């Protein structure tokens, strides 16, 4: 029913992949051989180990904190100089940009990356280069919001529209084409075919083989970069670097140093934010008054960390965690606690924001609304002081919409009514809680707080509703109930089976998977220029969709273990 809340719910194989003129450095992504004792590998391990030691052990720092910061800035400046030096031949920066983004350190190089990709986009369609280069160019441009037409891949197709034999054993190129295909939008038949062909062909090439290269390919197929939250892609990427056995360019070593220091800083930042979140939740006191409701501040702040990933947005993440926590609590009130009559009154109170109407409600509902009012007022005052605009009305309306959607589902369950799939999804997109959370995120980012933009966000635009559809349907693919929930309600799968008599569960689940794929295509399209929203907000919408699969990785007890959540930080 609610956001973030579940209801019912060997080497020989690849030897032909590298043309003689292929770049030899690592991340082209897969080496021809893996030698964990190679000099290059030993050097890379040493870089990572020494940087970590210098940061984590004060007695082994270069001299003092200033020295470490100086070296960090020196490495950043070195990379910026390389990117700027290639300004007349921007395509030479593509591999470096891919590495920077894969390591999650693009915050330091935003201007240089934007300038490079903009220049490449202005050059128009480029059909020259091998498959890997073409697909990489396509992916990087689309990630930045540039609409590159799929016709760029015409040279790899034969006259019948199939893929030419020359690319069928190009593992490096096929892998990059697979990654690029995940940014396709509706109506792109060439990329639909590329996704199906590369997935099948790469599995075929890897069949019966055991190697690190195979493992990395299989990880890419299971977790394509575009649909995977950044923290996991950077960890996977660093792991690849550590065991790659090739001579890599000097700039890669500089990037590794930057990434390692950033990683250590981020861990410290995260620990501080989590400490503040736990303190806030304890002082709020809801855990005592709404005893059966979930108390999971670690999980709630994990969502905020993944949605707003810029390290400079600590205050915004802490504030976003607060409404996320209330989504969970109110969801449990509707699912577990409340009688239908009480839920109807509670919804009316939220809709009118009427404190007087609380008198007839039980204490846990009164306390919950008071917490909701306090959080909404706190956020509104902060935004008004910072930006001169009062978001109170918009925030209250989002809570009213959520509660009304919860109430609809409560009535369905109470009466035994199983809605049509269309009815279910129309309401489910709202009851997912994604719209409410993304409205808060938009306001907290403080970008373009104009009447027109806020009204657009309030209307649950495609960039938000697509992400909500992904969450709702992912939720319903799960067969387990969320932890600590005694209540139940219908799922899309149940509605489908009821509406399409004779269908099997497998057929229903296949249908759901197809709808998720279409929702991703719509979300991809919404994030391309011209987009009415900032890149930071577009990325936040992508991030919430990327985070969904992670938050449904339950253990045997249908819980998200704390250690698992900590590993995501």
UniProtKB/Swiss-Prot annotation:
Magnesium found in the keyword field: yes
Residues annotated as binding Mg(2+) 2: 331, 335
Compartments, as annotated in UniProt: Plastid, Chloroplast
Cross-referenced Pfam families: Terpene_synth (PF01397), Terpene_synth_C (PF03936)
GO CC terms of this entry: chloroplast
Cofactor: Mg(2+); Mn(2+)
UniProt keyword annotations, A-Z: Chloroplast, Lyase, Magnesium, Manganese, Metal-binding, Plastid, Transit peptide
Chief place of localization: plastid
Co-factor binding details: Binds 3 Mg(2+) or Mn(2+) ions per subunit.
Pathway(s) this gene product operates in, as recorded in its UniProt entry: Secondary metabolite biosynthesis; terpenoid biosynthesis
Official protein name in the record: S-(+)-linalool synthase, chloroplastic
Organism from which the protein derives: Arabidopsis thaliana (Mouse-ear cress)
């Amino acid at each position: 029913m609610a956001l973030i809340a579940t209801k019912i719910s060997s080497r020989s194989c690849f030897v032909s992949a590298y043309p003689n003129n292929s770049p030899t450095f690592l991340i082209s992504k897969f080496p021809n051989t893996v030698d964990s004792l190679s000099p290059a590998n030993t050097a890379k391990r040493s870089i990572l180990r020494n940087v970590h030691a210098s940061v984590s052990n004060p007695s082994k720092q270069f001299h003092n904190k200033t020295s470490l910061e100086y070296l960090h800035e020196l490495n950043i400046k070195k990379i910026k100089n390389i990117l700027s030096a290639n300004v007349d031949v921007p395509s030479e920066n593509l591999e470096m940009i891919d590495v920077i983004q894969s390591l999650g350190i693009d915050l330091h190089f935003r201007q240089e990356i934007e300038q490079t990709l903009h220049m490449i986009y202005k050059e128009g369609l480029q059909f020259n280069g091998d498959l890997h280069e073409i697909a990489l160019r396509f992916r990087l441009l689309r990630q930045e919001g540039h609409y590159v037409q799929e016709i760029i891949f015409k040279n790899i197709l034969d006259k019948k529209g199939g893929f030419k034999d020359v690319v069928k054993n190009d593992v490096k190129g096929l892998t990059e084409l697979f990654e690029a295909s995940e940014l396709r939008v509706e109506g792109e038949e060439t990329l639909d075919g590329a996704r199906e062909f590369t997935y099948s062909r790469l599995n075929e090439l890897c069949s019966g083989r055991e190697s690190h290269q195979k493992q990395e390919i299989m990880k890419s197929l299971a977790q394509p970069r575009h649909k995977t939250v950044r923290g996991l892609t950077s960890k996977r990427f660093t792991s690849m670097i550590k065991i790659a056995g090739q001579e890599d360019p000097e700039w890669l070593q500089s990037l590794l140093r930057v990434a390692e220091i950033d990683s250590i800083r981020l861990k410290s930042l995260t620990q501080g934010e989590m400490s503040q979140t736990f303190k806030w939740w304890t002082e709020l006191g809801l855990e005592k008054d709404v005893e059966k409701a979930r108390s999971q501040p670690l999980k709630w702040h994990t969502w905020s960390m993944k949605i707003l990933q810029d390290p400079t947005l600590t205050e915004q993440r802490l504030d976003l965690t607060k409404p996320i926590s209330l989504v969970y609590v109110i969801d449990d009130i509707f699912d577990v606690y409340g009688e239908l009559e009480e839920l109807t009154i509670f919804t009316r109170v939220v809709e009118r924001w009427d404190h007087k109407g609380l008198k007839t409600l039980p204490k846990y509902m009164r306390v919950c609304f008071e917490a909701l009012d306090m959080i909404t007022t706190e956020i509104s005052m902060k935004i008004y002081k910072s930006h001169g605009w009062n978001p109170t009305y918009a925030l209250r309306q989002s809570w009213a919409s959520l509660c009304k959607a919860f109430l609809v589902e409560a009535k369905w369950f109470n009466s035994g009514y199983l809605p049509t799939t269309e009815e279910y999804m129309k309401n489910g997109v709202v009851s997912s809680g994604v719209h409410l959370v993304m409205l808060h995120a938009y306001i907290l980012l403080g970008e373009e707080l104009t009447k027109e933009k806020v009204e657009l966000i309030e209307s649950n635009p495609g960039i938000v509703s697509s992400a909500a559809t992904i969450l709702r349907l992912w939720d319903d693919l799960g067969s387990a109930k969320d932890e600590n929930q005694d209540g139940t309600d219908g799922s899309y799968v149940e509605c489908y089976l009821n509406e399409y008599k004779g269908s099997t569960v497998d057929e229903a689940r296949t249908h759901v998977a197809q709808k998720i794929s279409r929702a991703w295509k719509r979300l991809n399209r919404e994030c391309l220029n011209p987009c009415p929203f900032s890149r930071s907000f577009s990325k936040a919408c992508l991030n919430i969709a990327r985070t969904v699969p992670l938050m449904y990785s339950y253990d045997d007890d249908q819980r998200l273990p704390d250690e698992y959540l900590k590993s995501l930080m």
